[in-house]
Amino acid sequence: MSDAVDKMLAGMAANRQTMNRQLAKIDEIMERSNNTLLHIESNSKAFSQNVALSETQKMYNLRPEAEMTLSKILENFKLLMSSSDQREETYSALEGCLAYRHRVEHLGSSVRKLVALYDTVGQMKNSQEEQYASEDSP
């Protein structure tokens, strides 16, 4: 009987450690995505103020590093979700599952916003390139 209890406690401890690692990874991804969004937002505000001063200046400026950061965030999220789906089945504490679900929904929402932002920035970049190409052609 005590062996079964010990095994159950060991399993719960392992699940807790796994969950703590997942939380740390989610926090890291959220921090990076928030920093990226803040950077993009500050650039957007700076450019919107300067557009009135100079029409020849680019409206959107996205550095390749920012684009790579967004891609890495999305890749890490996919890896995290695929690895956590396997472990979620063995975890049975209701409160832990509900808290985990809430965090995943929040992260999923943030990722959807990042995907939309990435697509929008890509469209703006293509539009800007087309505009420059049409200005360069005689």
UniProtKB/Swiss-Prot annotation:
Enumerate the transmembrane spans: none
Give UniProt keywords alphabetically: Cell cycle, Cell division, Cytoplasm, Cytoskeleton, Microtubule, Mitosis
Q: Name one GO biological process term.
A: mitotic spindle assembly
Upon deletion of the gene, what happens? Viable but females are sterile. Mutant embryos show increased mitotic spindle length during metaphase and reduced mitotic spindle density.
Give an example GO cellular component term for this record: HAUS complex
Q: According to its UniProt record, where is this protein located?
A: Cytoplasm, Cytoskeleton, Spindle
Q: Which domain of life is it from?
A: Eukaryota
Assembly notes: Component of the augmin complex composed of dgt2, dgt3, dgt4, dgt5, dgt6, msd1, msd5 and wac. The complex interacts directly or indirectly with microtubules and is required for centrosome-independent generation of spindle microtubules.
Q: What does this protein do?
A: As part of the augmin complex, plays a role in centrosome-independent generation of spindle microtubules. The complex is required for mitotic spindle assembly through its involvement in localizing gamma-tubulin to spindle microtubules. msd1 is required for microtubule nucleation from within the mitotic spindle and for localization of Grip71 to centrosomes and mitotic spindle.
Stated name of the protein: Augmin complex subunit msd1
Species assigned in the record? Drosophila melanogaster (Fruit fly)
